[in-house]
């Protein structure tokens, strides 16, 4: 065998060894073509490429994280509440929901969420500012087209107004299982590019059959019994003149930041001195204010009901002016 006889096979062998990695890169173990295998190989070496985390890539990820939590893309604040299921994100509202605009005044006629019906929160109260009876409330809701089986979303002129919270609590009291407060106002809805209209929405009347739920609207005997922690949300000057014995004062402004209910972390500070193992009754001479605080307590997992200062006066007179304590519950 000549020298050239050895040279040619050697050259062929070297060529095959060089091409083998590229062949394997495009094949799976059974010998069929695998595009991902080829794409994941390094064309220069035939070795699988390794992901390299560059400083620039890390910076891009950090920028994305900052962007996602920016004011334009706020994180889901509902997760900050232990009982956030009673608040509904705007983007989760669907055509199957009955939307109630509980705002007072003439704002509804100017603009409202598309297909929202108008039930002003003041219509839930009688001439003395007390919550109407169950029969009258059921008639009002039925005439508006609502049934107890509906999925309901309520909003008001602003979260700070207490309008939607009062409607929410009245519906819960009547046994409405699926009712939530909208996480945002009409202005927030518009800013999100969601549909609005000025035309009044009218839906066919329905039969509203209530099933009264205890523990939402408190009664005198329960408040008198001492089974609940009593929170007074009237102006402090009124608290000083007379109050329910052993009550604690709380300014409703402490649960609001801007025109929204504070997030769970801040509310936790506000309510830090309240025991979750004890029911709470929130009272005022303005149900929108007591409802605002009671709803905020419910968001944080407390069992909270509303009560009327007027009802207490009807039974007890002006109330005690000594056996009470003023506590500023966590201004944040």
Predicted regions and their residues:
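Cytosolic catalytic domains that perform sulfur/thiol-centered chemistry
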Residues: 23-332
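Bacterial N-terminal signal peptides
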Residues: 9-21
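Generic N-terminal leader/processing signal
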Residues: 1-2, 22
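Bacterial N-terminal signal peptides that target proteins for export
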Residues: 2-10
């Amino acid at each position: 065998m000549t020298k050239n006889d050895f040279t040619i096979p050697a050259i062929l062998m070297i060529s095959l060894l060089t091409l083998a990695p590229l062949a394997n890169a495009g094949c799976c173990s059974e010998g069929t073509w695998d595009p991902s295998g080829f794409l994941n190989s390094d064309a220069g070496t035939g070795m699988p490429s390794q992901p390299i985390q560059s400083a620039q890539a890390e910076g891009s990820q950090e920028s994305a994280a900052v962007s996602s939590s920016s004011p334009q893309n706020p994180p889901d604040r509902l997760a900050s509440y232990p009982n956030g299921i009673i608040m509904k994100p705007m983007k989760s509202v669907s055509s199957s929901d009955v939307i109630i605009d509980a705002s007072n005044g003439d704002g509804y006629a100017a603009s409202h969420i598309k297909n929202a019906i108008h039930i002003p929160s003041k219509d839930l109260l009688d001439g003395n500012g007390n919550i109407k009876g169950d029969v009258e409330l059921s008639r009002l809701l039925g005439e508006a087209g609502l049934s107890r089986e509906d999925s309901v979303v309520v909003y008001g002129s602003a979260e700070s107004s207490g309008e939607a919270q009062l409607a929410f609590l009245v519906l819960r009291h009547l046994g409405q299982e699926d009712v939530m407060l909208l996480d945002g106002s009409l202005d927030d809805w518009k800013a999100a590019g969601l549909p609005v209209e000025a035309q009044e929405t009218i839906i066919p009347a329905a039969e509203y059959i209530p099933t009264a739920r205890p523990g939402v609207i408190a009664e005198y005997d329960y408040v008198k019994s001492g089974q609940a922690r009593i929170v007074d949300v009237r102006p402090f000057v009124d608290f000083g003149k007379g109050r329910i014995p052993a009550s604690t004062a709380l300014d409703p402004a402490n649960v609001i930041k801007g025109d929204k209910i504070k997030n769970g972390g801040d509310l936790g500070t506000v309510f830090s001195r309240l025991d979750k193992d004890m029911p709470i009754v929130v009272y005022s001479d303005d149900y929108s204010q007591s409802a605002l605080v009671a709803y905020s307590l419910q968001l944080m997992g407390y069992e909270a009901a509303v009560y009327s200062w007027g009802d207490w006066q009807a039974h007890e007179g002006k109330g005690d002016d000594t056996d009470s304590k003023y506590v500023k519950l966590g201004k944040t």
